[in-house]
Amino acid sequence: MAVTKLFARYVYDSRGNPTVEVDLTTDKGLFRSIVPSGASTGIHEALELRDGDKSKWLGKGVTKAVANVNELIAPAFVKANLDVTNQSAVDDFLNKLDGTPNKSKLGANAILGVSLATAKAAAAEKNVPLYQHLADISGSKQDKFVLPVPFQNVLNGGSHAGGALAFQEFMIVPTDAPTFSEALRMGSEVYHNLKSLTKKKYGQSAGNVGDEGGVAPDIGSPREALDLIMDAIDKAGYKGKIGIALDVAASEFYKDGKYDLDFKNPNSDESKWLSGEQLASLYEELINEYPIVSIEDPFGEDDWDAWVHFYSKVSSKVQIVGDDLTVTNPLRIKTAIEKKAANALLLKVNQIGSLTESIKAAQDSFDATWGVMVSHRSGETEDTFIADLSVGLRAGQIKTGAPARSERLAKLNQILRIEEELGDKAIYAGKNFHAASQL
């Protein structure tokens, strides 16, 4: 089924910044996709095209990307008479039209909007749910679908929050729940307990939420944050049933070959900055003291030696996730696999800028027996594409914020609907989240 019309506009994301929305029309109807954006972005990511005009939106406008869809992509796309059910041909066409290695001519945000809207149109063309179509084009097993474990970011630090805490995200991971809906209930109850404990201990304003819905109290150390979360898990009655995951986002505080855990202080003491090995030792202590099941971006994105050293120590105990390290880029993923630097991929569709390349990144990871965690960005929207993607890919893990803020819950609510629709044709990944593709 060919596309009769393609149109883009700008709308706003959850941080109040403009982003690209694409409407793609076929004989079956209109299919809409909105592109997310990140706060901490890896230097190896595909280029998100922003206007740079400081007099409007503080330079963050996307009118160029929108114009690229409407003036360059749309006429060529409609003329090419592409079949929406052939996703790889569509994405190949878009990449050739751009012609740069990092999508800097048209903008990854322009290309991705069209790519994702195409998949939605294809699902309608085939009269199947989006997750089913995504399973088809990614070659996933479909005897039973796997529902992901929701990694819920309940406490924010790093670049996502004020306060001194360097680590960016502390997540609860309900691995022992029997179903996705129960996992979400457990997460919600822990989250509410955490909010009330936080307000009690740090004052009313500490219960205010960060970009991704987590609380952001003025906490100084990772242990203080972990103790608070453990108390909330205990208070909710789930001791021993919920794991913890960290997204350190260490590239944000990697300076001159060292790690500055006091990076938000302009006068931080250089003598206290840690080497990669010292930081690895801190992680090992935390892994031994707390039920940590996954650590993302423990080191700087080009500090390969630290990653390899850490992998050799703990890869049998915890999942080591590459985000800034791998940026959903096949070349970076290949290097990380060869070097034995990580054992899981954080999959963000806007880091690579097309659906086909995102699926390829997941497949390469699965082939290396890596885990794959499908992820939102901190600048999110009401679009629920990644919920269907996590199910269609059989990823077994999704990271989409706290059980708060509608742009986060939109994804979690969509998985609830998918769970209901699939009934006994679905299983919850639970403790097998790392190897869900094999279930």
UniProtKB/Swiss-Prot annotation:
<dbReference type="InterPro" id="IPR020809">
    <property type="entry name" value="Enolase_CS"/>
</dbReference>
<feature type="binding site">
    <location>
        <position position="296"/>
    </location>
    <ligand>
        <name>Mg(2+)</name>
    </ligand>
</feature>
<feature type="active site" description="Proton donor">
    <location>
        <position position="212"/>
    </location>
</feature>
<feature type="binding site">
    <location>
        <position position="323"/>
    </location>
    <ligand>
        <name>Mg(2+)</name>
    </ligand>
</feature>
<comment type="subunit">
    <text>Homodimer.</text>
</comment>
<dbReference type="InterPro" id="IPR020810">
    <property type="entry name" value="Enolase_C"/>
</dbReference>
<dbReference type="GO" id="GO:0006096">
    <property type="term" value="P:glycolytic process"/>
</dbReference>
<keyword id="KW-0456">Lyase</keyword>
<dbReference type="Pfam" id="PF03952">
    <property type="entry name" value="Enolase_N"/>
</dbReference>
<protein>
    <recommendedName>
        <fullName>Enolase 2</fullName>
        <ecNumber>4.2.1.11</ecNumber>
    </recommendedName>
</protein>
<dbReference type="GO" id="GO:0000287">
    <property type="term" value="F:magnesium ion binding"/>
</dbReference>
<dbReference type="GO" id="GO:0000015">
    <property type="term" value="C:phosphopyruvate hydratase complex"/>
</dbReference>
<dbReference type="Pfam" id="PF00113">
    <property type="entry name" value="Enolase_C"/>
</dbReference>
<keyword id="KW-0963">Cytoplasm</keyword>
<feature type="binding site">
    <location>
        <position position="399"/>
    </location>
    <ligand>
        <name>substrate</name>
    </ligand>
</feature>
<comment type="similarity">
    <text>Belongs to the enolase family.</text>
</comment>
<feature type="binding site">
    <location>
        <position position="323"/>
    </location>
    <ligand>
        <name>substrate</name>
    </ligand>
</feature>
<dbReference type="InterPro" id="IPR020811">
    <property type="entry name" value="Enolase_N"/>
</dbReference>
<comment type="pathway">
    <text>Carbohydrate degradation; glycolysis; pyruvate from D-glyceraldehyde 3-phosphate: step 4/5.</text>
</comment>
<feature type="active site" description="Proton acceptor">
    <location>
        <position position="348"/>
    </location>
</feature>
<keyword id="KW-0324">Glycolysis</keyword>
<keyword id="KW-0479">Metal-binding</keyword>
<feature type="binding site">
    <location>
        <position position="247"/>
    </location>
    <ligand>
        <name>Mg(2+)</name>
    </ligand>
</feature>
<feature type="binding site">
    <location>
        <position position="160"/>
    </location>
    <ligand>
        <name>substrate</name>
    </ligand>
</feature>
<dbReference type="InterPro" id="IPR029017">
    <property type="entry name" value="Enolase-like_N"/>
</dbReference>
<feature type="binding site">
    <location>
        <position position="296"/>
    </location>
    <ligand>
        <name>substrate</name>
    </ligand>
</feature>
<feature type="binding site">
    <location>
        <begin position="375"/>
        <end position="378"/>
    </location>
    <ligand>
        <name>substrate</name>
    </ligand>
</feature>
<dbReference type="InterPro" id="IPR000941">
    <property type="entry name" value="Enolase"/>
</dbReference>
<dbReference type="GO" id="GO:0004634">
    <property type="term" value="F:phosphopyruvate hydratase activity"/>
</dbReference>
<dbReference type="InterPro" id="IPR036849">
    <property type="entry name" value="Enolase-like_C_sf"/>
</dbReference>
<keyword id="KW-0460">Magnesium</keyword>
<feature type="binding site">
    <location>
        <position position="169"/>
    </location>
    <ligand>
        <name>substrate</name>
    </ligand>
</feature>
